[in-house]
């Protein structure tokens, strides 16, 4: 088109020619049409246009195409911002940054304008208001979804059916209840990872109980940090742990057998002070707490009279606590200061054994050693104790340690830093509570009274796994719970060491 003089475009020109008037009218129409198109383009980024024809098939088209989560929400205790953007009522959700072949032409131009900066992006940010600081895929949800309930969260890696169920709930129509949606997902073989309003409190309780269940299932000695990370990343079971009653047929065999992995053996210790007025020591009885409320006797122990050091005899017969009886199963012996204890079975002392006895394999076996840190008058705070037990082999059996001299004992190996075939445990450090002005530990309701004898035994690499816990519930009643790799005899002897008086630890 050749340029014309500016005077030709003036409506009140002196030249009144029909041809030029027609050309002028055509130019005016073209200019008005061009301005209309430009105005429309400038207005399009300000509003997401809804397409009624594309809506019914948009949900089906997204099934095989969108694998990323619709909404990625990070929740914290202090609250977090949910990025929601207002849009037209007819559009359920639009994912930015994704190519959708079924979208109309106006929506394509909207996406192109959204990716570019400038006036359009600034105007949209001003209009939407809440959408800021977002990286990665985000979702534009209509105002109706906020009134219906919280945004459903789909984790990365879920199947398309689970994502389709989430999109159906977030789209138009009536939102199904949590039970119906969970049942639909279970029929399709999908584990529910969605949060429902009516199940929020139950899920928090299940997560805490499942984390405790995962922490109770530990391989062999529970000494590697890798197992801790694997247990933390493993999916938590949906059903709570069912109570399991441990069968006790042979008392001696049960007392020496390590606790099954993943099962906490809950016991109760009662102290009988009969005969103390005649110079006798109290007797301690260990019972197994069953889920039906019944109690099963396991072990009995009492301190021997006329012994140079503390010497507790342990028996499977509550009426026969003599060393020469058939029910004698082991003993606990301390040093002169009462700070170090060793647990033996009913084998023969190597210093009193003959040469034939040494070769026959009937030497006594060391089952545990307990070492209390000296703390005169309690100036160093609460008690600190270390527990050394034999390690476990590949088939979860206890390694046999039968020392023939003082250099092969558990205490000697531990003091010489020879940690081969042994496991070192320690008590969990209690936390000072300003309200009660005392040191406290979380016994999960199993201990109700404060006492210097209360303790929890853990491994240094896994402080959340409680190997054993002991505490007072009444004047002469105590609870004792133990887990793998301890056995009943080891745990009972460790508890007896806590009862004994300690000259350097009081």
From Swiss-Prot:
Bias (Low complexity) ranges: 70-87, 101-116, 207-221, 230-243
One BP term from GO: phagocytosis, recognition
Listed InterPro entries: Tubby-like_C, Tubby_C, Tubby_C_CS, Tubby_N
Location in the cell: Cytoplasm; Nucleus; Secreted; Cell membrane
Record membrane topology: Peripheral membrane protein
GO cellular component: cilium; cytoplasm; cytosol; extracellular region; nucleus; plasma membrane
Chain intervals for the UniProt region annotation (Disordered): 36-244
Biased composition (Acidic residues): 196-206
Key words, A-Z: Cell membrane, Cytoplasm, Membrane, Nucleus, Obesity, Phagocytosis, Secreted, Sensory transduction
Superkingdom in the source lineage: Eukaryota
MF annotations from Gene Ontology: G protein-coupled receptor binding; intraciliary transport particle A binding; protein-containing complex binding
SUPFAM superfamilies: Tubby C-terminal domain-like
Function: Functions in signal transduction from heterotrimeric G protein-coupled receptors. Binds to membranes containing phosphatidylinositol 4,5-bisphosphate. Can bind DNA (in vitro). May contribute to the regulation of transcription in the nucleus. Could be involved in the hypothalamic regulation of body weight. Contribute to stimulation of phagocytosis of apoptotic retinal pigment epithelium (RPE) cells and macrophages.
Family that this chain belongs to: Belongs to the TUB family.
Illness association: Retinal dystrophy and obesity: A disease characterized by obesity, night blindness, decreased visual acuity, and electrophysiological features of a rod cone dystrophy.
Subunit (UniProt): Interacts with GNAQ. Interacts with TULP1.
Record's protein name: Tubby protein homolog
Species: Homo sapiens
Gene giving rise to this polypeptide: TUB
């Amino acid at each position: 088109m050749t340029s014309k003089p500016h005077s030709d475009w003036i409506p009140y020109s002196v030249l009144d020619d029909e041809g030029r008037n027609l050309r002028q009218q055509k130019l005016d129409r073209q200019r008005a049409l061009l301005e209309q198109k430009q105005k429309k383009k400038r207005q399009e980024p300000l509003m997401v246009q809804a397409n009624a024809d594309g809506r019914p098939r948009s949900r089906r088209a997204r099934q095989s195409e969108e694998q990323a989560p619709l909404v990625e929400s990070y929740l914290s205790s202090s609250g977090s911002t949910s990025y929601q953007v207002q849009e037209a009522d007819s559009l359920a959700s639009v994912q930015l940054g994704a190519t959708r072949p079924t979208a109309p032409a106006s929506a394509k131009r909207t996406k192109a304008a959204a990716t570019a900066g400038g006036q359009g992006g600034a105007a949209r940010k001003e209009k939407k208001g809440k959408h800021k600081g977002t990286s990665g895929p985000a979702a534009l949800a209509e105002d109706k979804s906020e009134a219906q309930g919280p945004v459903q969260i789909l984790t990365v890696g879920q199947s398309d059916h689970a994502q389709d169920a989430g999109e159906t709930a977030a789209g138009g129509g009536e939102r199904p209840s949590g039970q119906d949606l969970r049942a639909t997902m279970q029929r399709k073989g999908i584990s529910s990872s969605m949060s429902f309003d009516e199940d929020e409190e139950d899920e928090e309780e299940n997560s805490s109980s499942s984390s405790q269940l995962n922490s109770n299932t530990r391989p062999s000695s529970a000494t590697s940090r890798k197992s801790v990370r694997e247990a933390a990343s493993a999916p938590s079971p949906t059903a709570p742990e069912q109570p399991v009653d441990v069968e006790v047929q042979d008392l001696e065999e049960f007392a020496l057998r390590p606790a099954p992995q993943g099962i906490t053996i809950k016991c109760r210790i009662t102290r009988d002070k009969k005969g103390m007025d005649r110079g006798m020591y109290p007797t301690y009885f260990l019972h197994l707490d069953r889920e039906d409320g019944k109690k099963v006797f396991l072990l009995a122990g009492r301190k021997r009279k006329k012994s140079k050091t503390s010497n507790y005899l342990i028996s499977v017969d509550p009426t026969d606590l003599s060393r020469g009886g058939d029910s004698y199963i082991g003993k606990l012996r301390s040093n002169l200061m009462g700070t170090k204890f060793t647990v033996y079975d009913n084998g023969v002392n190597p210093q009193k054994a003959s040469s034939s006895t040494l070769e026959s394999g009937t030497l006594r076996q060391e089952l545990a050693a307990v070492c209390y840190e000296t703390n005169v008058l309690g100036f160093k705070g609460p008690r600190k104790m270390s527990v050394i037990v034999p390690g476990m082999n590949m088939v979860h059996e206890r390694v046999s340690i039968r020392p023939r001299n003082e250099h092969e004992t558990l205490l000697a190996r531990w003091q010489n830093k020879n940690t081969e075939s042994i496991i070192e445990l320690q008590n969990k450090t209690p936390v000072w509570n300003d309200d009660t002005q005392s040191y406290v530990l979380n016994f999960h309701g199993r201990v109700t009274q404060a006492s210097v004898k209360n303790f929890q035994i853990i491994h240094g690499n896994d402080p959340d796994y409680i190997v054993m816990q002991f505490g007072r519930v009444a004047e002469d009643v105590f609870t004792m719970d133990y887990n793998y790799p301890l056995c009943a005899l080891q745990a009972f002897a460790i508890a007896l060491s806590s009862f004994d008086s300690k000259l350097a630890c009081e």
